[in-house]
UniProtKB/Swiss-Prot annotation:
Region (Disordered): 170-197
Alphabetical GO biological process terms: negative regulation of canonical Wnt signaling pathway; negative regulation of DNA-templated transcription; negative regulation of gene expression; negative regulation of response to cytokine stimulus; negative regulation of transcription by RNA polymerase II; positive regulation of anoikis; regulation of growth; regulation of transcription by RNA polymerase II
Gene name linked to the record: Tle5
Protein origin, superkingdom: Eukaryota
Phylogenetic classification of the source organism: Eukaryota, Metazoa, Chordata, Craniata, Vertebrata
Record's function text: Transcriptional corepressor. Acts as a dominant repressor towards other family members. Inhibits NF-kappa-B-regulated gene expression. May be required for the initiation and maintenance of the differentiated state. Essential for the transcriptional repressor activity of SIX3 during retina and lens development.
GO cellular component: nucleoplasm; nucleus
Biased composition (Basic and acidic residues): 175-197
Tissues where the protein occurs: Ubiquitously expressed in developing embryos by midgestation, a wide expression is conserved in adult. In mouse, abundantly expressed in muscle, heart and brain.
Name of the protein described by the UniProt record: TLE family member 5
Residues recorded with modification Phosphoserine: S196
Keywords assigned: Nucleus, Phosphoprotein, Repressor, Transcription, Transcription regulation, Ubl conjugation, Wnt signaling pathway
Source species: Mus musculus (Mouse)
Localization: Nucleus
Molecular function per GO: transcription corepressor activity
Region described as CCN domain: 166-197
Length: 197
């Protein structure tokens, strides 16, 4: 008689224990789900940030690649110009007197010895002149600037863009000299024509 009662009493405690562990497990699962959801949200934000940085890096890579390609083209162009000018100097040099030949050779050797500080100074002067011309074109009031200080309205210039600007300025100067020489040649031809008349 006692055996069935003890078995019945033991079975009556099982649903309460089972109910308690199920509720506790659900709470733990809910907490873990919320934690995982917060981690997922944080990782998603970080992934979006990395994707944005990746696209920005790709944009910078394309920009630097184009700049590098342009500098490479400009370097080959300047090397070809130097080679042609050296050829012209070599052709003209024998027609000079011995004294003038030595002077010209010395001047050519001195011209080849360009130091980095001299190059930086030349680039800085060219950029300042270019920026002043831009300010004058915009009709902005000009105030004297300390050495090395750039106008606030103009973006900061990096070394690569500085070289590109310098090369662009050099090409403009070269073109203006060619135009001037061509104009002088036209005036000489007109003078010769008037003299022949």
């Amino acid at each position: 008689m006692m055996f069935p009662q003890s078995r019945h009493s033991g079975s009556s405690h099982l649903p309460q224990q089972l109910k308690f562990t199920t509720s506790d497990s659900c709470d733990r699962i809910k907490d873990e789900f919320q934690l995982l959801q917060a981690q997922y949200h944080s990782l998603k934000l970080e992934c979006d940030k990395l994707a944005s940085e990746k696209s920005e890096m790709q944009r910078h890579y394309v920009m630097y690649y184009e700049m590098s390609y342009g500098l490479n083209i400009e370097m080959h162009k300047q090397a070809e110009i130097v080679k042609r000018l050296n050829g012209i100097c070599a052709q003209v040099l024998p027609y000079l007197s011995q004294e003038h030949q030595q002077q010209v050779l010395g001047a050519i050797e001195r011209a080849k010895q360009v130091t980095a500080p001299e190059l930086n100074s030349i680039i800085r002067q060219q950029l300042q002149a270019h920026q002043l011309s831009q300010l004058q074109a915009l009709a902005l009031p000009l105030t004297p600037l300390p050495v090395g200080l750039q106008p606030p309205s103009l973006p900061a210039v990096s070394a690569g863009t500085g070289l590109l600007s310098l090369s662009a300025l050099g090409s403009q100067t070269h073109l203006s000299k060619e135009d001037k020489n061509g104009h002088d040649g036209d005036t000489h031809q007109e003078d010769d024509g008037e003299k022949s008349d």
